[in-house]
């Protein structure tokens, strides 16, 4: 079918129009493929977590591992973004949560990937870990444009995307997948913009502590 369509385009349109139309079609195909991939991953995550046995996970170890990987990759990029970890309020305390380690890594990786994609060059992303009552609190702040205040309550909706074209294509499933995984861990996630003179997005994740 694809060959027939391409042959039709080649025989009915002039060269310039044909190139533009093929580019549009290719772009749409890539978007649909990305959507299918993300949706399939979401279903896989839900199925995996429904079967998985949760155990005690050292959240600080997860954070250190994921951030180290990201900083290593960012060294080879041209954006010059640095991810900093702050857990000074813990005074050396361990932060253990109930969870599936690979999925906790996925949560942080997805959130950092989102933060990096919106961050300008020569900026910093902060990852903070604290204990808030009976939960582990994970906060990620970037120095990007932040969320659109009018639609901030929709950012975790399935297929919702308000990403400007300059920040690249997006399926609208990334944050929804993260939210699903967090809720399957018994946690919650909140999106907001930083307050005061600070500019950028703020994500707060709460996960039940292991007792």
Please report, for each region that a protein language model flagged, where it lies by residue.
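Short conserved segment of the HATPase_c
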Residues: 147-159
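Short alpha-helical segment of the dimerization/phosphotransfer core of two-component systems
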Residues: 27-32
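Conserved glycine-rich
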Residues: 187-188
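Short conserved segments within the C-terminal catalytic ATPase subdomain
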Residues: 73-88
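A conserved beta-strand-to-alpha-helix junction within the catalytic ATP-binding
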Residues: 53-71, 87
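Conserved micro-motifs of the catalytic ATP-binding
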Residues: 13, 47-52, 92-99
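Short helix-loop "hinge" at the ATP-lid/N-box region of the Bergerat-fold HATPase_c
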Residues: 115-116
């Amino acid at each position: 079918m694809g060959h027939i369509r391409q042959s039709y385009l080649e025989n009915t349109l002039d060269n310039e129009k044909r190139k533009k139309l093929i580019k549009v079609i290719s772009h749409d195909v890539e978007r649909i493929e990305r959507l299918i991939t993300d949706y399939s991953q979401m279903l896989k995550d839900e199925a995996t977590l429904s079967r998985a046995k949760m155990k005690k996970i050292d959240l600080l170890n997860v954070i250190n591992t994921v951030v180290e990987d990201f900083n290593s990759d960012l060294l080879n990029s041209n954006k010059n973004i640095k991810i900093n970890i702050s857990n000074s309020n813990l005074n050396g305390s361990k932060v253990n949560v109930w969870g599936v380690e690979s999925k906790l890594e996925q949560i942080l990786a997805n959130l950092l990937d989102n933060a990096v994609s919106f961050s300008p060059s020569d900026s910093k992303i902060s990852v903070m870990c604290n204990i808030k009552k009976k939960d582990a609190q994970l906060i990620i702040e970037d120095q990007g444009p932040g969320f659109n205040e009018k639609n901030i309550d929709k950012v975790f909706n399935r297929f919702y995307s308000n990403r400007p074209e300059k920040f690249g294509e997006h399926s609208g499933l990334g944050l929804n997948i993260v939210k699903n995984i967090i809720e399957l861990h018994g946690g919650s996630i909140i999106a907001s913009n930083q307050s005061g003179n600070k500019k950028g997005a703020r994500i707060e994740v709460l996960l039940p502590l292991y007792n």
